[in-house]
């Protein structure tokens, strides 16, 4: 396992549409291992392969929270070629953040429940229902695979403000 660099807005790679994974290979397994290590190190609860400059339809997630004793039991999840096949009419609002847009959080409205179809690390096609934060995280990460960022759901004014801030920061870092 190794840490990978997380690409940051305004990197144009974040707008790429990721390609389907044809087969779960040792390289895909290594990518998944690296993604988990990178996600946990950041720390974050979800990561799409494109965020580590790999335009493949792969997502890692872990929504585990510390228990009463402060211990966190990991609940790693892998979604290969995920697609939302059903969503509720009911909406919910969660404050979202993104490892590729560090230290910026905003409320986003999305379907409260979704059904997702994906391939697991064993190459098995699965379907699963998700609700609450789990559903929000799945939708957020699948958006990444389609070149969509959570700031795209904000007003034009807010989105432009965020883009300007991160573009300036990138220019300063390049100087």
From Swiss-Prot:
GO biological process: co-translational protein modification; translation
Catalyzed reaction equations: N-terminal N-formyl-L-methionyl-[peptide] + H2O = N-terminal L-methionyl-[peptide] + formate
InterPro entries in UniProt: Peptide_deformylase, Peptide_deformylase_sf
UniProtKB keywords: Hydrolase, Iron, Metal-binding, Protein biosynthesis
Residues annotated as the enzyme's active site: 141
Pfam family, one: Pep_deformylase
Bridged cysteine pairs (disulfide): none
Transmembrane spans: none
Enzyme Commission number(s): 3.5.1.88
Domain of life: Bacteria
GO molecular function (one): metal ion binding
Cofactor note: Binds 1 Fe(2+) ion.
Residues engaged in binding Fe cation: 98, 140, 144
Gene3D superfamilies associated with the record: Peptide deformylase
Family to which the UniProt record says this protein belongs: Belongs to the polypeptide deformylase family.
Summary of the function given for this chain in its UniProt record: Removes the formyl group from the N-terminal Met of newly synthesized proteins. Requires at least a dipeptide for an efficient rate of reaction. N-terminal L-methionine is a prerequisite for activity but the enzyme has broad specificity at other positions.
HAMAP family: Pep_deformylase
The protein's name: Peptide deformylase
Source organism per UniProt: Bradyrhizobium sp. (strain BTAi1 / ATCC BAA-1182)
